[in-house]
From Swiss-Prot:
Any GO BP: peptidoglycan biosynthetic process
Modification N6-carboxylysine occurs at: K228
GO cellular component: cytoplasm
Origin: domain of life: Bacteria
Chain's gene name: murE
Source species of the chain: Acidovorax sp. (strain JS42)
Residues that bind meso-2,6-diaminopimelate: R393, D417, N418, P419, R420, G468, E472
Lineage, highest ranks first: Bacteria, Pseudomonadati, Pseudomonadota, Betaproteobacteria, Burkholderiales
Protein name: UDP-N-acetylmuramoyl-L-alanyl-D-glutamate--2,6-diaminopimelate ligase
Alphabetized Pfam families for the sequence: Mur_ligase_C (PF02875), Mur_ligase_M (PF08245)
Family membership noted in the UniProt record: Belongs to the MurCDEF family. MurE subfamily.
């Protein structure tokens, strides 16, 4: 370590970078342009420090690396420095580098096992509608999440729910410079645990729900919860929106009472600061009454599923926390359409109804099937479920999802999702361990064939849920991604039946 300059404070690191970097900061050596700074730490799949040579060859003016365990990389030179705890400090460094961009944005951060994507997308969509029409002072809302970064629907894919802190702070700066005044972001438990949001000023934190997921990353449910819970102790947080129908949410709400936060409880089941009542299915979607104290308004939505009512309440409460009047918040929500890959439907006369949804946890699959059950009953048809589970992810949920599918659907085809590095048949076997052998559950390892099979056999009045991949346009197996879209395969299968979707 004698030849490697060691920094001791965050400010020292920022100053060191400013003295050398004339471009921007990057955490991916392949994106380096001459004059850029490269930040490298050990990751889950690769160690960024192994790519310092590549970064330098591409013109990096400075490389800031994690100090701990750096010796094997034999790094040296005036353009390389080390900082202990770099990964956790990068968010603060990036925020400082890009001029603290979230001081110019109202950031709404959504956390929870399910519902983050829909809630964040709808927040951005609703606020953008209002900024164009009723409330131009809002000046628009950007989005960061599973579907990408930007202003919906024009998003740049990142491959992560919560991007790395350098990419995130750069995006915030670009949003602020473009004149946007708000940003809705999905705050994943992994993103929070890895400090990707550090350095971000958050105005409103929203909690959707808490069920099993990501136990391939977190050592247990307690650690998974603590990662999400940290969002509600965020420095400078002004408001919190909490779904109290969720037991963990009810406990969180109780903990937050008496704090300085503008606290919004939301509920479909009982008293709350914002409550949904008189929920009914209509031809257009769910209709309901929204009550805030004694003030009530009727909302006709274009979505189905009680979980989506909960998501919409979160959107309304988030807007209310920003000062949007209730009536205008509801006007915007009435115009919201399903999010890509989230209960996205294909409908054609005389053909089964298809719903493509990202549901990839036991609770999300239950909620999706529960939402479609009354639709199938209304049509006088059966409910089908085509799904699989991702490889190299929480394996404990596989039999649970098998049990949910068999319990809720009339016909189940278990297939491949993104097998990644696992054997597809092995994943399917683990899913089937949660089912009882019978004629209602079968397996087809080829996802395209499974979708085709379901839509060839389904009756015209049936409803077919294709779950797990949602918006994704690829399938990942054995280290390769090949083009694959559930929606495209469903359209093709309907076309073979003679239906136009």
């Amino acid at each position: 370590m004698n030849a490697l300059h060691t920094l001791t404070t965050l400010q020292e690191a920022v100053d060191w970078l400013r003295q050398r970097v004339t471009g921007t900061l990057q955490t991916d050596s392949r994106l380096i342009q001459p004059g850029d700074g490269f930040i490298a730490w050990p990751g889950a799949a690769t160690d960024g420090r192994a790519h310092v040579g590549d970064a330098v060859a591409r013109g990096a003016a400075a490389c800031l690396v994690e100090c701990e365990g750096v010796e094997p990389f034999a790094l040296a030179g005036d353009h390389i420095a080390a900082l202990r705890g770099l990964k956790a400090a990068t968010g603060m460094i990036a925020s400082e580098w890009f001029g603290h961009p979230t001081q110019r944005l109202q950031v709404l951060a959504v956390t929870g096992t399910n519902g983050k994507t829909s809630t964040a997308w709808w927040l951005a969509d609703a606020l953008n509608q209002l900024s164009k029409e009723e409330l131009p002072a809002l000046a628009g809302c950007a989005l960061v999440g599973t579907l990408g970064m930007g202003v919906p629907p024009a998003l740049q894919t990142t491959g992560m729910t919560t991007p790395d802190p350098v990419r995130l702070q750069r995006a915030f700066a670009q949003f602020a410079e473009a004149g946007h005044r708000a940003c809705a972001i999905e705050a994943s438990s992994i993103g929070l645990a890895e400090h990707r949001l550090d350095g971000t000023r958050i105005h409103v934190a929203l909690f959707t729900n808490f069920t099993q997921d990501h136990l391939d990353y977190h050592p247990g449910m307690a650690a998974y919860w603590q990662a999400k819970r940290a969002l509600f102790d965020w420095p400078g947080l002004r408001a919190a929106v909490v779904n109290v129908d969720d037991p963990q949410g009810a406990a969180l709400h109780a903990e937050l009472q008496g704090s300085d936060l503008d606290l919004w409880s939301i509920s479909l089941q009982g008293p709350a600061r914002l409550q949904a009542k008189h929920i009914v299915h209509t031809g257009a979607g769910l209709a309901l009454t929204v009550a805030e104290g004694a003030h009530t308004e009727v909302l006709q939505t274009q979505v189905i599923g009680l979980y989506n009512v909960s998501n919409l309440l979160g959107v309304i409460a988030g807007m209310r926390a920003l000062g949007v009047p209730l009536a205008q918040a509801l006007q915007a929500c009435a115009r919201l359409r399903p999010v890509p890959g989230r209960m996205e439907q294909l409908a054609a006369a005389g053909q089964p109804l298809v719903a493509v949804d990202y549901a990839h946890t036991p609770d999300a699959l239950h909620q999706a099937l529960a939402a479609l059950k009354p639709v199938a009953a209304q049509r006088g048809g059966r409910l089908w479920c085509v799904f699989g589970c991702g490889g190299n992810r929480d394996a404990g949920k596989r039999p649970l999802m098998g049990a949910v599918a068999q319990r809720e659907a009339d016909e189940v085809i278990v297939t491949s999702d993104n097998p990644r590095g696992e054997e597809p048949q092995s994943i399917i076997h683990q899913i089937l361990l949660g089912t009882i052998a019978g004629t209602s559950v079968r397996a087809e390892v080829d996802r395209a064939a499974a979708i085709a099979q379901a839509l060839a056999e389904a009756g015209a009045n049936d409803v077919v849920l294709i779950a797990g991949k949602g918006h994704e346009d690829y399938q990942e197996a054995a280290g390769q991604r090949v083009p694959f879209s559930d929606m495209a395969h469903a359209r093709a299968a309907l076309a073979r039946r003679g239906g136009v979707a």
